[in-house]
Amino acid sequence: MKKLVAYITSAYPEKSFSIDLALALGDNGVDTLELGVPFSDPVADGPLIEKANHKSLEFGFKFKHLLEISEAVAPKVDTLWMGYFNSFYQQDMSKLIPLASKIGVNGLIIPDLPHEEALTYSDLFKENSLSNISFVAPTDSEERIKKVISDSQKFIYMVAYAGITGSGQAEDLQPFLSSIKKYSDTPVYVGFGVSAKTAKDKVKGADGVIVGSAFIDILLKDNLTYAQKIKQCSELAQIL
């Protein structure tokens, strides 16, 4: 059975909604929740997630909201934080990582933290039983792939398309996937460039799929009530 990771932007449109949505997703087939930390310049994300980031910040998102959502959700749904390094660095990594572990968060996904710099924090993550998810991209050399995944934890984040999230580009990922699996037994999840339409094709041979923009697209629809948004996201989770 393939694993499903769902990304949602924290506290968009508000904290209590994020908690209700996260728990509903957990009840409807989502194995892992990726709680996005709103950031003003989310360079790796597509227009939908960027818009949700900006709206959450406009609505007054504070880092404490992420902590409060996580405290409510992490005991019930496997939870990761996804955010840009500056968001975490400003909280003091030496204090934040132990706090995340105490809350029950199981790992961080930091797309703009290069592997070489992430090594600075490897002991901190290990001491607190927290995973720092490794990224590999189709543009990486075989040598770099070997280096990056040598210390991979929980799962390897395989970038489906060397661009921005949610692009839904169609391409053959099997050779790239095979090259990763040659060097590691760590599960490989496909993300970045996965849309609702391409999820089933792109997950072939992988151990899981990460979907964000398809859920955010629903959340951005102003004509839907909160209950309708949760219902549609839950239905999407069931068919992915």
For the regions a protein language model found, what residue spans apply to each?
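Active-site-adjacent beta->alpha loops and helix N-cap segments on the catalytic face
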Residues: 15, 39-51, 57-69, 88-94, ...
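Hydrophobic faces of well-ordered beta-strands that scaffold small-molecule active sites
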Residues: 4-8, 33-35, 79-83, 108-110, ...
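Histidine/lysine/aspartate-rich catalytic loop segments that bind and position anionic ligands
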Residues: 130-167
